[in-house]
């Protein structure tokens, strides 16, 4: 996953409109935000998504990558903790000539807002470590099987959006 934060390889199969969040942002509903990785000097924000609860996206995980990032804002519930699963209940993608704005609204009471000049969405088939963690580590047990930036993944397909490109057609 870490390599995809630096660049999405060309030649990946394009996603069908039903899986492309830039054609239909509601494709993200049901996915869970598991990690947000911010690289300030590079202007890159990566959002890892768990897909086991998604009804529209194949694969086990996905990476939503925003480049030329100028805004990354998370607003979350005060009652949330490290065990909270942030399930996407609504999403919006807005694009004009200078910026792409992505909003992910989650339960319980969380929102992620990203603004940048380009975005990529890559569906992945993850190969997480299958060695069960110690039963005395509840945090590790909870995250067992969930992808992080060091997990080996196989890309299944990608969608791309640029601020100066025509908006995808449905």
Task: List PLM regions with ranges.
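Surface-exposed, interaction-prone regions used to assemble/regulate multi-protein complexes
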Residues: 1-170
